[in-house]
From Swiss-Prot:
Membrane topology listed for this record: Single-pass type II membrane protein
Listed name of the protein: Neprilysin-1
Lineage: Eukaryota, Metazoa, Ecdysozoa, Arthropoda, Hexapoda
Name of the encoding gene: Nep1
Organism domain of life: Eukaryota
Function: Metalloendoprotease which functions in fertility and memory formation. Required in the dorsal paired medial neurons and alpha/beta mushroom body neurons for the proper formation of long-term and middle-term memories. Required in males to maximise egg-laying in female mates and is also required in females for their fertility.
Positions of Zn(2+) binding: 684, 688, 746
Region of interest called Disordered, as start-end residue ranges on this chain: 41-63, 146-167
Length: 849
């Protein structure tokens, strides 16, 4: 999910400040930790008002302003810095041999006094700023009806309406964790906005101002900041010297990362290995002076070799996976092509002509770098773009492919040969599987793009072989370009400037961390969990899953559009969901972990060879599943990612270790924040089992119609309400509206997850009582639940990224994920006392689950 900022080695060595204390950190009832690049970490004790006033007067007399800012690591911690943060730390004056000892000591003493003076000034300013800020918050909260009614006051001890800071003060949490959490929430908010008109601006307005989009990415969000923080951790564990705790798997991960970082060695190797690969595949015609089609390499054989040896599915998406109608059996599956550009609209819409020109230029410049003739390369590759556009044109738009049952088609190999006679399917599939997996004469297979395959065959039959060969090898070259450096990287950046709006490439270390985690994720996960995963998180998450699933079942029993029989089967499916939390157990078993990578060779001094080895290893590992039963207990995602998943074929919900952290979860958070964070994520994944796709699969993971027709029609009516609602959200960056069809499954899950998590939280509150309030916020925990949910989606995007999201993303942009579910929530409207008819409390709401 992200591209990363530069981080220092020192930052990698320290525990991250995520806005809460580590589990073993000492707690002080009335103190707060302030982190400043100038002074390091300081303990700030609460002081008497006259002391605060004196320090504020001293600050006003000083010429340099005091700046309150978010910690530069994006953690949400609050720092205080004197002067202009961009100027950096002042240099230290050191003594020379010409000074006497007493002068040196006096100089050192003066410096100490100066540092102490600055420290006291900064700490006083911090307290003064917080006092003023909290007073402002108190006033704003009353202005926008954040105060609860009398009936909401816990035991009548806290009289919010009076504004008293003394009555019921034991109900205010003043631990370091609570102060930090409150400061983190406040630092993101725009208190000048009305929460009943634009809750995204209210919750995230200041965060978005404080986090401009970096040059090396097309968007910024809290998700990406969390991923940035996690990448710093992963960098640290990958850079650790190999020691006795390592096994063959973790050594391979560290070795791959090291080879990726070895730029001098990569330069030394150059492009020789890439050119060898192209030559072994018949040569790339555009860079060959006298190219002719190899007699022993048909189009079908070349497609198969690209799939088997380089994980490159050209023209056809081919893979082995669970049969949707028999989820215990692996089967060959084929689908329409993967696009080189983000979506089919980039090839077909007139408004994307500039993107197509940039794509053609990128293709041409790379070919020139590899030795193509400048006089002919552009014209030759223009034919490639036209050929690719023809293929894209006969593919179906993703919005028309949401109903899996309509695109699923199971058949035997001879039937496919009869339907698409232009392709020699036996030759292609055997080349893709390799000699170790003999293809059966009546091999069963599933297609999800039969219309595309039929039309593709016709296009192939009428296209010159040179054009086809040029296209196929270009797709391999394009995939490998992200791993190239220097002039190849510069051409890629120029292309991405047009396509994505980015202005520079990411730092090398962040690229290497991402590739290592994606390619060797299980081994990286084993390194990550050693010191960066709290087992208590797993237990708490499991407890929350049970309470949120119970809330789903309650809501299921209350809905009035489902018949009793279907409702009973739906409950069975929800109760049968398997939970996978944190990481698979094999991460702690060195023997099993080593077996995972037993057929993979990684060398310390040849990065491009390592990349090619991994591509072949990945492909062979996946294709070997063909004759094997489906292992429904096996994890299919790496543990160190900030995400969560639902798999319809396994009916399981997965919450990797990477997402069990703030803002989603912390053992120090109030329950309202945890339920508004990871709780909504849990509800979201549960609801995926019943969205427009998930509802087509039973509790065993098999696609079948287990709803009656009346219930299906009622579901579609409610789904259409969601589609229509989200299609009315306008993306101002490009002056276009959302396509509610593309994102319907995720929108249904967002709305259902929010409702379930809030109900589960209220049940927890009934059983355990109300928690202490957070200081300075003057907000109820119901309000904090929705605030934390909203702040998960803080962020902004470039126009280029906005266009890509509209055209191809299955998730709505962050602001829509806030406004949509909250405006459908009666619980939210009640918590914030939004008048009926206000923007965030419309009279007509959409509800599916």
């Amino acid at each position: 999910m992200s591209q990363q900022h530069e981080a220092t080695a020192a930052a990698a060595e320290k525990p991250l400040n995520n806005g809460y204390l580590q589990a073993n950190a000492p707690l002080e009832e009335l103190s707060a930790t302030v982190v400043s690049p100038l002074l390091g970490q300081q303990q700030v004790q609460h002081q008497a008002p006259h002391q605060m006033q004196q320090q504020q007067q001293q600050q006003q007399q000083n010429k340099l302003p005091t700046v309150v800012f978010l910690a530069p690591d994006g953690s949400g911690g609050v720092g205080i810095q004197r002067g202009n943060p961009a100027q950096g730390n002042p240099g230290m004056v050191t003594g020379t041999g010409s000074h006497s000892d007493w002068l040196l000591k006096e100089s050192q003493q003066r410096r100490r006094l100066l540092v102490l003076a600055i420290a006291f000034t900064v700490l006083g300013a911090a307290i003064g700023a917080l006092a003023i800020y909290f007073a402002s918050v108190h006033q704003r909260c009353h202005l926008y009806r954040l105060e609860p009614d009398n009936d909401d006051r816990p035991n009548g001890r806290w009289n919010q309406d009076s504004g008293s800071a003394h009555e019921g003060q034991d109900n205010i949490c003043m631990t370091q964790e609570c102060v930090r959490t409150a400061a983190s929430l406040l630092s993101a908010m725009d208190l000048n906005s009305d929460p009943c008109e634009d809750f995204f601006q209210y919750a995230c307005g200041t965060w978005n101002k404080m986090h401009p989009i970096p040059e090396d990415r097309s968007s910024i969000s809290t998700f990406e900041v969390l991923s940035d923080q996690q990448q710093v951790i992963l960098r640290a564990v990958l850079e650790e010297p190999i020691d006795e705790r390592d096994n063959k798997a973790t050594i391979k991960a560290k070795t791959f990362f090291k080879s990726c970082m070895d730029i001098p060695q990569i330069r030394k190797i150059g492009t020789g290995r890439l050119k060898q690969v192209l030559q072994s595949l018949g040569g790339w015609p555009v860079i060959e002076r006298n190219w002719s089609p190899p007699a022993d390499l048909s189009v079908e054989r070349l497609m198969g070799q690209l799939r088997l040896n380089y994980s490159e599915p050209v023209m056809i998406e081919l893979y082995v996976g669970a049969d949707d109608k028999n989820s215990s059996v692996n089967i060959l599956q084929m689908d329409q092509l993967q696009y080189a550009l983000p979506s089919r609209d980039y090839y077909l819409k007139e408004s994307s002509a500039n993107d197509r020109r940039a794509y053609h230029r990128y293709m041409t410049q790379v070919a020139l770098l590899l030795g193509a003739d400048p006089a002919t390369a552009a014209a030759e590759l223009e034919k490639v773009v036209l050929f690719e556009t023809q293929l894209v044109n006969v593919s179906l738009p993703e919005a028309d492919r949401h109903d899996t049952s309509l695109v699923y088609r199971k058949m035997l190999l001879p039937e496919l040969q009869e339907l698409v006679p232009e392709v020699q399917w036996q030759e292609y599939l055997q080349a893709a599987l390799g000699p170790g997996i003999p293809l059966q004469e009546d091999e069963p297979l599933v297609t999800y793009g039969l219309h595309y395959l039929t039309e593709m065959g016709k296009i192939l039959a009428h296209t010159d072989r040179r054009v086809v060969h040029n296209y196929m090898l270009w797709r391999l070259v394009m995939s490998l370009m992200s791993h190239m450096i220097d002039e190849y990287q510069r051409e890629r950046v120029e292309f991405r400037k047009i396509l994505m709006g980015i202005q520079s490439e990411r730092t090398r270390w962040s690229q290497c961390v991402e590739w290592t985690n994606k390619k060797l994720g299980v081994a990286v996960g084993a390194l990550f969990i050693r010191d960066n995963f709290n087992q208590e998180s797993k237990e708490v998450a499991l407890e929350m899953i049970h309470t949120i699933r119970a809330a789903f079942n309650e809501l299921l029993a209350e809905n009035d559009w489902m018949d009793d029989e279907t409702r009973a089967v739906a409950k069975e499916k929800a109760d049968s969901m398997n939970e996978r939390i944190g990481y698979p157990e094999l991460l702690t078993n060195a023997t099993e972990l080593e077996q995972e990578y037993v057929n993979l060779t990684i060398v310390p001094d040849n990065f491009i060879n390592n990349v090619l080895s991994i591509l072949q290893w990945e492909s062979e590992k996946m294709l070997r599943l063909l004759r094997q039963p489906v292992d429904k207990e096996k994890w299919t995602t790496e543990p160190a990612v900030v995400n969560a998943f639902y798999n319809p074929n396994k009916n399981d919900i997965v919450f990797p270790a990477g997402i069990l952290q703030p803002l989603f979860y912390s053992q120090h958070f109030p329950k309202s924040l945890n339920y508004g964070g990871i709780g909504v994520v849990i509800g979201h994944e549960i609801t995926h089992g019943f969205d427009d796709k998930g509802r087509q699969f039973d509790k065993e993971g098999n696609m079948m119609q287990w709803w009656n027709n009346a219930t299906i029609e009622a579901f579609r009516e409610r789904t259409q309400c969601v589609i229509d609602q989200y299609s009315r959200y306008k993306i101002n960056e490009v002056d276009m509206f959302m396509d509610g069809r593309m994102t319907q499954g995720e929108n249904i899950a967002d709305n259902g997850g929010l409702k379930q998590a809030f109900r589960a939280y209220k049940k927890w509150e009934t059983l355990h009582g109300r928690e202490q309030q957070l200081p300075g916020l003057n907000m109820t925990h119901d309000q904090l639940f929705f605030l934390n949910y909203a702040q998960i989606w803080c962020g902004s995007m470039r126009p280029e990224d906005a266009l890509t999201k509209i055209r191809s993303a299955v998730h709505s942009p962050g602001f829509v994920r806030v406004l949509g579910p909250l405006s459908n929530s009666r619980d939210f409207a009640s918590a914030y006392k939004c008048p009926l008819g206000s923007t965030m409390n419309p009279a007509e709401k959409c509800s599916v689950w």
